[in-house]
């Protein structure tokens, strides 16, 4: 449809629609960088300081960089400090290095820089050219170049007047310290006239000035004695520095500025004050729409400091009002919420502190520490750019075995590009290895210790043994000696006592000796350790004693563990995580830490505490549970995992039970068999007893013997029966079991495969074990006598497919599951105590993707914008904002208007609504219906308010708000849906049909829709207006049919109607019928089925409709609100009852008349039928009576004469008549007429009916309106009493905004003051739109001049979403606010240059009027040379130029043009001239002035010459003198002066005009004789056209495309200098057809274009369009044909050049080479050339036949140059006079062509003039034709004979016309053709007239 086609053609948004994308674009944008050029002392540093302070960029200067490094007290700073302290200067190389490092710093990467000292005059380390190349190659290249211009004289005077304070180091200018200058400034200010002030105000102002002057003089007196002049400020030093600058840097800097984009080159007048320079730069930056660096603002309140324990909600609510931008514009919450963005970038989720909260891009960010705050403040971009905020992905997954942990972990890892750490596979093996290593080391250490102990013991034993042997030997020797001596000296009696005493002494001595010897031995042993050790045997780990020592150690080695095993496990886990985090290939921008998921982590509390100590806690703990199904799914998976083992145990148990049962059954069987045997034996015995009576005693004895045997304890009979019954029952059940059960038999042990270990998920498709029947063969117990071949059939118990068998074998698994749950509950409390987020997910009936979605949502929820219900605090904030706004807005007119609306409406109007405005977003998304939300059900999301239709809708939005808001484009609005209401007869159907046609939507008439539904079945319409007629017609039809049948008459078909079918209506149809007939409301069920098709089903759903006549009742309106079928608006047509009477009553009366007429006709027809029937019946009865009489006579048998019974017959006739009258009496209708309703009564009755219906409908409409007001449906009232086309127009105008502004139906704009708008931009609270200060509305209307903001034309800022738009006036503001989407869907504004216009013309031509009009409407500077001179003298009186001007003026001389142009050039550097533009009035007027302007490169975009005749000039002068007031001095407006000026102007203007037309093609002549409005429109049209050319050129060049250079003031010299490889030949023609088309024949640039810095000229518009579309195809390297060298290019020769080539002869002996080649080199194609068409190619001369042939050769010389003549040439042609030819030849050479044309025309026309022969007629026609088309005849002659020829043809056509119109019979004049008489008279008048002269 049309709407869809329109959507496809929509232009993309100028500004990014998505707010997050806008912030991302801002973060990715390059910061604005400045560089300032200028002479030393021009003020670069001061200007840089001011710009850096205002623009928030970093000032990169040597001094500031050095001070920063020294203050940092780092290594570089210490080195710099030492150099300075030692008195050395810092090397230039080091300074340059530090500056470059500063430029590459993160701070500069965000804020940008402003550079002033590169390039520098220092050439030792690096030349100026190298410095410039260094600046050009910077990563952040300068965007804005500022050039401060100042003359050498002015700069030297200013610099040498500077003084420095000896203590503070502050530099003062002469204006600040010189008392004389201060005094002169005071005098000038005092002499300045003060207007509009009272005497008291003047006195107060003078007193204040006097006090300020005294204070300033005191300050000067204090500092004057401390001021010194620096050596560099001496005049001679300044002059040397300036000279050095001009020699070394100026030329190179000029080249840099010439290469730079002129739009971003700002030139300043250095004579202005620093404040003026700064304001000029700021205005220029504002005009250029340069992005300002986004500032970071620390949010800290003046109240008590907040603690970190404060709630997050309270924190944000409190901090958002710190440093408030304005009421209602608080700081927003970011995606990071309270998380620290710097820590999050590192992979740690730390909560930010309240004291470290900052604002950036309008949002709040909480930093966690002073260090993170510092990093964020330097450059927040790396921490905020996508993919941030992103959860670091530190996850622990817990859960029972086989619940799906591995699957979920892998899915999470895949989603977050992370790695899974399986604790059992990666950590536990390492821990086991470490433990084994510990055991091994312990055993090794114990072994070494044991070996040393054994070695030491063996050594000690050996030493002791040796010592003992030595001691024993010594004792033996001593003892033998002493014994021998004692034996000799003493007697035998004293021997025992001596022995005892000697033994004691000897033992004492021996002890002392042993002690001394042992000491000696030890000392000796220490000296001889090596020899001793070598002497003992070698001890190894296999030594028995060593093994005995290690036996206990080896016994406890397996139980050996670390002292803190959990710490060791945590340490290993830390190592694994670190290895995982070292993975650099995760994804770009990934956090430093994180990216891991741990599974199978032990549920050990001590291990978790170790993780806390190691700071290894995860961000999220996921626990997978199966609580919902009570572990059913987990047990199912565990069973499947261990199916073979469990099934085996189940089968084993079942087989044992079956065997036990079998054994029991066998025992019972044996007992029964024994009983049967005994019974049989007893029976046999009894039989024997009866047979043998002799042996009774013996039998009794035998029986008694048998009965006395010890029998087993048999069961009683009942028990036996039960056993037998149970056996039979079991056998029957066994027989009922089919042979093939649900499952398959259990495979044999050899075929069973073991299930691999590990936590792997079972496959989704598997056969439940309950469906499996297992048959097992078991051998019967031989003890029980069972055969080995008997088979026992055992089946596994059945269970659900997703369940498990409830058997005792599952109890261990259940126990394991219960133990896991208990362990988790114990660990869960520990986890929660450490504030780690825990997510418990039930896996029941959930897919892995659903589990992943749940986990991802939980992980990402902290980093998404959250929505919350509007609470009391929000309403309090809104009330505070409203109160603050009321206090601020005092004088606003809008405020006065709003006060009339009421406070609630004002609050609603100012409330910042969400992406669906006041409509419910949930209903919009789900039902595509615009349902107004309930303000009580409000939610705040991203600082915007959303209304909802119900609590359920609000809950949906709170759960997933991002699903219901716009993302990259506005939400699509449903089509227009309108309910049109009005009383019957108000014209709503006509209006609805017209509106539907205009808007392209459906028109639905509700009553007609119901009638159509009924017509399908009942084939008739229902309603009061249809019921009466139909019933009456049926009755009449029935009566007519009966009468016709009686009368035997056939009634015409058109008098009757088709018999309606008798149908059975459904309940729905009965309800519709009742609604139509009795005007009852329809039931809700029927309304729902009908309306849902229009609101919810295609094609009406997406097209829209106008619902005519619905709702009809309040109940139906209430149903619309309850069901959610909301129209956009309800249009109610208001009319009075009289209007209804005037419209409907005439038709009703006419209908009544028609009805009455038909009724009378029916009555007449019925009457006639009844009369005919009566007559037939009377005639029949009469015949019967006569027959009776005749019969009676015959019965009497008497015959009488006629005379006899005439009287009797007469009486009998009377009797018959009487009888007929009695039987057929006359109808009462015939006797008396029925009383019929008269017209007046009918009219009154109809009027009353209409009035009652109107009143009823009006009341219903009022009730409906009340219902619509309740559900907030807009009501549009339209006065329907006016003419219908006016009502339609009014209705169309009221509904048109709903259609035209449909795409902006959800958009809301908020106007703000200009001050607030700029404040928001400075804080980067809102973004400047791509339109900058362009008016989007005017831009869409074709405006090319940017509006300017001043006191007279203030801009109107408007906030739309996250951008600020500046509108030029209130009208455009209203347009934009009504449909902002329309105006932001347009191309971005093209780059503009300041408009520079000159207007020249004679005096009184209107130059100044046009110039002032341009200045007032567009803000241009209106400048004349006099204004420039006066501005120079007033603003810079001490400058060199002002001194020179005063020198000339004081001598009474005129200012020389050179000085005037210099003053004009300085004036053109003003801010307005460089931003908006300038219009120069009345300049230049002499060629010299023109040359000076050209030398200064002052080239206007366009020059307007107002051409006014001299007579008009003096006429305007006289009118001006009549109206002007008399002045005290004479004016230069006398007629003589004006005449002199006019003459002087006309004398010089031609030369000036020719110069600009030739050089710049920018001269436009305007006819000034017209009105000033006509002149203004013409000037404006030309300016707009020129602006479009320039803007298009700049846009295409910036995009790297080809652009047309027409009307760009390019001089021929510049064109030649920048021509491309093809010079002035068309590259398109050369590429496509290999033709050389020289475009230098014309100087026009209409078909010229620029591409890659070169100019190319094309031959036509078509070629230009091709080149502009694909320029790469026509220039190298893709160009197919290069341009030949100059010596191979053809050159056209003039006659003089041709003569100069003599005696060189022409090629081909002068024959035309083109004609010869095109003629296929035939003999007839040898045509001599004409010397006027000569050319030179390849140093050869060729002569062509004509200009056309010459151009052919010039285009394709290769085709024609190399030809050879044939041997036979045609003879030379001699000239013959035409008159010497014979007549046929003469005619052939002279008039053949014209004569042939005339004869062909005569042959086609076949003329025949009336009353002339054919021959004479043809001759006359040929003669007239020759005269009319004679090329040598005069224009007058040709026109004359053309008229005669046309008259001749018309007269010839008279014969054809009259022959076709005339008839043989006479026709009266009124029956003839209109022109017949005139043409006939003309025909007859030609009889005697000369056809040539007549």
From Swiss-Prot:
GO terms for cellular component: cytosol; microtubule cytoskeleton; motile cilium; nuclear membrane; nucleoplasm. Highly expressed in the testis. Residues 1005-1036 are annotated as: NMP 2. One of its GO terms (molecular function) is nucleoside monophosphate kinase activity. The keyword Cytoplasm applies. Disruption phenotype: Mice lacking Ak9 do not display developmental abnormalities and exhibit normal spermatogenesis with normal sperm counts and architecture. However, spermatozoa progressive motility is markedly reduced. It is an enzyme of class 2 (transferase). InterPro entries: AAA+_ATPase, Adenylat/UMP-CMP_kin, P-loop_NTPase. Residues 188-211, 492-533, 710-789, 876-911, 1223-1243 are annotated as: Disordered. Broad-specificity nucleoside phosphate kinase involved in cellular nucleotide homeostasis by catalyzing nucleoside-phosphate interconversions. Similar to other adenylate kinases, preferentially catalyzes the phosphorylation of the nucleoside monophosphate AMP with ATP as phosphate donor to produce ADP. In vitro, can also catalyze the phosphorylation of CMP, dAMP and dCMP and use GTP as an alternate phosphate donor. This is Adenylate kinase 9. It comes from Mus musculus.
């Amino acid at each position: 449809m049309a709407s869809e086609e329109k959507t496809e053609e929509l232009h993309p948004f100028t500004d990014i629609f998505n707010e997050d994308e806008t912030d991302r674009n801002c973060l990715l944008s390059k910061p604005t960088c400045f560089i300032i050029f200028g002479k030393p002392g021009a003020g670069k540093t001061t200007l840089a300081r001011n710009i850096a302070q205002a623009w928030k960029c970093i000032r990169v200067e040597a001094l500031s960089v050095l001070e920063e490094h020294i203050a940092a007290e780092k290594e570089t700073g210490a080195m710099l400090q030492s150099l300075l302290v030692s008195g050395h200067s810092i090397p230039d190389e080091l300074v340059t290095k530090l500056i470059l490092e500063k430029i590459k710093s993160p701070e500069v990467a965000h804020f940008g820089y402003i550079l002033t000292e590169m390039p520098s005059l220092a050439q030792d380390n690096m030349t100026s050219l190298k410095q410039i190349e260094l600046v050009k190659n910077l990563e952040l290249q300068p965007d804005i170049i500022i050039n401060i211009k100042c003359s050498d004289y002015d700069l030297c005077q200013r610099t040498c007047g500077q003084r420095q304070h000896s203590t503070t180091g502050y530099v003062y200018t002469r204006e600040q310290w010189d008392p004389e200058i201060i005094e002169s400034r005071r005098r000038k200010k005092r002499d300045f006239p003060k207007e509009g002030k009272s005497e008291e105000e003047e006195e107060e102002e003078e007193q204040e000035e006097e006090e300020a002057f005294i204070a300033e003089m005191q300050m000067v007196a204090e500092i004057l004695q401390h001021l010194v002049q620096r050596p560099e400020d001496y005049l001679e030093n300044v002059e040397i520095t300036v000279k050095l600058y001009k020699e070394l840097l100026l030329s190179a800097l000029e080249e840099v500025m010439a290469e730079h984009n002129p739009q971003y080159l700002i030139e300043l007048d250095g004579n202005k004050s620093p404040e003026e320079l700064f304001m000029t730069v700021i205005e220029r930056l504002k005009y250029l729409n340069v992005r300002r660096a986004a500032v970071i603002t620390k949010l800290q309140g003046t109240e008590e400091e907040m603690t970190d324990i404060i709630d997050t909600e309270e924190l944000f609510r409190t901090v958002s009002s710190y440093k408030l931008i304005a009421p209602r514009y608080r700081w927003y919450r970011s995606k990071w919420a309270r998380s620290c963005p710097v820590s999050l970038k590192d992979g740690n989720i730390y909560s930010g502190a309240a004291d470290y909260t900052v604002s950036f891009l309008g949002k709040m960010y909480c930093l966690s520490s002073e260090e993170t705050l510092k990093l964020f403040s330097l450059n927040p971009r790396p921490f905020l750019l996508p993919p941030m905020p992103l959860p670091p992905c530190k996850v622990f997954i817990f859960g029972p075995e086989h619940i799906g942990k591995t699957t979920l972990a892998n899915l999470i890892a895949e989603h977050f590009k992370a790695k899974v750490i399986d604790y059992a596979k990666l950590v536990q093996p390492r821990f086991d290895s470490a433990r084994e290593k510990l055991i091994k080391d312990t055993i090794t250490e114990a072994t070494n210790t044991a070996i040393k102990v054994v070695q030491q013991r063996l050594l000690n034993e050996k030493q002791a043994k040796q010592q003992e042997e030595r001691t024993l030997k010594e004792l033996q020797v001593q003892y033998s000696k002493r014994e021998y001596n004692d034996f000799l000296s003493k007697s035998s009696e004293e021997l025992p006592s001596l022995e005892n005493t000697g033994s004691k002494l000897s033992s004492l001595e021996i002890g002392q000796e042993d002690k001394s010897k042992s000491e000696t031995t030890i000392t000796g042993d220490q000296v001889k350790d090596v020899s001793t050790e070598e002497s003992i045997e070698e001890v190894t780990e296999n030594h028995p004693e060593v093994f005995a020592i290690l036996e206990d150690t080896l016994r406890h080695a397996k139980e050996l563990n670390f002292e803190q095993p959990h710490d060791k496990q945590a340490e290993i886990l830390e190592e694994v995580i670190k290895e995982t985090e070292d993975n650099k290939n995760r994804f770009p921008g990934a956090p430093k830490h994180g990216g891991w998921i741990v599974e199978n982590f032990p549920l050990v509390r001590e291990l978790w505490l170790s993780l806390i100590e190691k700071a290894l806690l995860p961000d999220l703990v996921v626990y997978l549970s199966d609580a919902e199904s009570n572990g059913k799914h987990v047990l199912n998976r565990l069973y499947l995992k261990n199916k073979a083992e469990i099934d085996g145990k189940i089968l084993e148990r079942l087989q044992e039970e079956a065997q036990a049962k079998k054994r029991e059954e066998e025992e019972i069987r044996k007992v029964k068999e024994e009983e049967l045997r005994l019974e049989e034996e007893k029976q046999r015995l009894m039989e024997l007893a009866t047979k043998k009576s002799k042996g009774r005693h013996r039998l009794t004895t035998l029986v008694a013997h048998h009965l006395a045997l010890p029998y087993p304890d048999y069961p009683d009979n009942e028990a036996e029966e039960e056993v037998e019954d149970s056996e039979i029952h079991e056998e029957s059940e066994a027989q009922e079991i089919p042979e093939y059960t649900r499952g398959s038999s259990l495979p044999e042990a050899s075929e069973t495969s073991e299930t691999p270990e590990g936590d792997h998920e079972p496959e989704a498709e598997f056969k439940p074990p309950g469906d499996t029947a297992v048959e097992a063969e078991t051998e019967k117990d031989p003890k029980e006598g069972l055969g080995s071949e008997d088979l026992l059939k055992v089946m596994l118990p059945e269970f659900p497919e997703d369940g498990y068998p409830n058997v005792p074998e599952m109890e261990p698994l259940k126990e394991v599951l219960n133990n896991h749950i208990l362990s988790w509950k114990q660990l869960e409390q520990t986890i929660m105590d450490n504030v780690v987020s825990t997510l418990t997910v039930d896996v029941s009936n959930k897919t892995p993707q659903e589990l992943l979605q749940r986990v991802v949502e939980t992980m990402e929820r902290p980093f998404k914008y959250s929505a919350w219900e509007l609470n009391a605090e929000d309403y309090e904030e809104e009330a505070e904002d409203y109160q603050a706004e009321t206090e601020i807005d005092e004088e606003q007119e809008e405020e006065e208007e709003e006060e009339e609306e009421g406070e609630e409406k004002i609050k609603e109007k100012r409330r910042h609504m969400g992406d669906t405005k006041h409509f419910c977003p949930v209903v919009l998304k789900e039902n595509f219906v615009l349902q107004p939300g309930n303000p009580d059900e409000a939610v705040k999301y991203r600082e915007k308010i959303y209304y909802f239709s119900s609590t359920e809708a609000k809950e949906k939005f709170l759960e997933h708000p991002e699903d219901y808001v716009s993302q990259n484009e506005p939400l699509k609005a449903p089509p227009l849906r309108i309910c049109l209401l009005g009383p019957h007869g108000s014209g709503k159907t006509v209006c609805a049909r017209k509106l539907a046609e205009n808007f392209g939507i459906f028109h639905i008439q509700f009553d007609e829709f119901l009638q159509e539904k009924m017509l399908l079945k009942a084939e008739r319409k229902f309603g009061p207006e249809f019921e009466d007629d139909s019933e009456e017609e049926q009755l009449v039809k029935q009566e007519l049919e009966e009468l016709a049948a009686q009368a035997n008459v056939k009634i015409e078909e058109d008098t009757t109607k088709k018999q309606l079918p008798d149908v059975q209506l459904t309940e729905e149809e009965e309800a519709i019928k009742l609604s139509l007939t009795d005007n009852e409301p329809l039931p809700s069920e029927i309304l729902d089925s009908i309306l849902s098709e229009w609101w919810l089903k295609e094609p009406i759903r997406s097209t829209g409709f106008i619902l005519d006549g619905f709702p009809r009742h309040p109940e139906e309106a209430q149903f619309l609100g309850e069901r959610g079928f909301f129209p956009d608006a309800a249009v109610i047509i208001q009319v009075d009852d009289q209007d209804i009477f005037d419209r409907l009553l005439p038709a009703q009366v006419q209908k009544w008349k028609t009805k009455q007429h038909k009724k009378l006709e029916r009555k007449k027809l019925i009457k006639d039928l009844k009369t005919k029937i009566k007559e037939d019946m009377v005639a029949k009865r009469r015949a019967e009576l006569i027959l009776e009489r005749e019969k009676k006579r015959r019965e009497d048998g008497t015959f009488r004469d006629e005379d006899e019974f005439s009287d009797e017959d007469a009486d009998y006739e009377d009797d018959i008549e009487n009888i007929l009258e009695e039987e057929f009496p006359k109808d009462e209708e015939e006797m008396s007429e029925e009383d019929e309703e008269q017209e007046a009564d009918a009219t009154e009755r109809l009027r009353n009916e209409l009035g009652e219906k109107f009143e009823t409908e009006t009341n219903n409409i009022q009730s409906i309106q009340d219902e619509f007001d309740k559900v907030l449906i807009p009501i549009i009232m339209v006065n329907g009493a006016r003419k219908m086309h006016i009502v339609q127009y009014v209705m169309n105008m009221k509904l048109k905004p709903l259609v035209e502004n449909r795409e902006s139906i959800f958009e809301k704009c908020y106007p703000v003051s200009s001050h607030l708008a700029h404040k928001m931009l400075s804080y980067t609270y809102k973004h400047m739109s791509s339109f900058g200060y362009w008016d989007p509305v005017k831009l869409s209307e074709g405006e090319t001049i940017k509006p300017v903001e001043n006191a007279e034309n203030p801009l109107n800022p408007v906030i739309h979403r996250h951008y600020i738009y500046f509108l030029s006036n209130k009208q455009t503001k209203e347009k934009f606010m009504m449909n902002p989407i329309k105006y932001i869907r347009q191309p971005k504004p093209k780059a503009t240059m300041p408009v520079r216009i000159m207007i020249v013309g004679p005096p009184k031509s209107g130059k100044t009027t046009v110039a002032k009009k341009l200045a007032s409407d567009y803000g241009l500077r209106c400048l004349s040379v006099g204004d420039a001179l006066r501005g120079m003298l007033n603003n810079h009186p001490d400058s060199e130029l002002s001194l020179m001007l005063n020198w000339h003026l004081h001598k009474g001389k005129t200012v020389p043009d050179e000085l005037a142009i210099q003053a004009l050039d300085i004036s053109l550097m003003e801010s307005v001239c460089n931003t908006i533009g300038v219009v120069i009035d009345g300049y230049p007027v002499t060629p010299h002035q023109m040359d000076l302007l050209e030398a200064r490169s002052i080239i206007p975009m366009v020059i307007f010459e107002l051409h006014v005749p001299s007579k008009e000039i003096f006429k305007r002068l006289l009118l001006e003198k009549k109206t002007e007031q008399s002045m005290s001095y004479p004016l230069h407006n006398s007629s003589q002066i004006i005449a002199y000026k006019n003459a002087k102007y006309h004398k010089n203007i031609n030369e000036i005009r020719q110069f600009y037309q030739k050089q710049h093609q920018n001269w436009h002549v305007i006819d000034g004789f017209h009105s000033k409005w006509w002149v203004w429109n013409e000037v404006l049209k030309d300016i707009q056209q020129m602006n479009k050319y320039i803007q298009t050129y700049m846009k295409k060049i910036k995009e790297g495309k080809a652009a047309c250079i027409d009307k760009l003031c390019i001089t021929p010299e510049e064109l030649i200098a920048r021509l491309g490889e093809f010079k002035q030949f068309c590259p398109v023609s050369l590429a496509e057809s290999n033709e050389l088309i020289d475009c230098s024949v014309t100087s026009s640039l209409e078909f010229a274009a620029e591409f890659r810095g070169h100019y190319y000229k094309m031959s036509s518009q078509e070629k230009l369009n091709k080149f502009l579309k694909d320029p790469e195809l026509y220039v190298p390297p893709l160009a197919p044909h290069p341009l030949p060298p100059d010596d191979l290019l053809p050159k056209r020769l003039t006659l003089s050049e041709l003569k100069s080539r003599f005696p060189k002869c022409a090629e081909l002996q002068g024959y035309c080479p083109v004609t010869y080649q095109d003629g296929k080199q035939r003999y007839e194609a040898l045509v001599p050339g004409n010397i006027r068409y000569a050319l030179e190619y390849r140093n050869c001369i060729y002569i062509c036949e004509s200009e056309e042939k010459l151009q052919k050769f010039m285009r394709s010389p290769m085709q024609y140059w190399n030809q050879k003549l044939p041997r036979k040439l045609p003879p030379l042609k001699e000239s013959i006079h035409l008159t010497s030819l014979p007549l046929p030849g003469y005619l052939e050479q002279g008039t053949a062509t014209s004569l042939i044309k005339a004869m062909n025309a005569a042959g086609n026309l076949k003329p025949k003039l009336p009353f002339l022969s054919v021959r004479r007629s043809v001759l006359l026609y040929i003669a007239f034709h020759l005269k009319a088309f004679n090329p040598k005849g005069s224009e007058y002659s040709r026109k004359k004979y053309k008229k005669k020829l046309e008259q001749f043809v018309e007269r010839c056509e008279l014969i054809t016309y009259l022959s076709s119109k005339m008839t043989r019979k006479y026709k009266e004049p009124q029956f003839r053709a209109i022109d017949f008489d005139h043409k006939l008279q003309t025909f007859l008048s030609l009889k005697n007239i000369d056809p040539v002269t007549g």
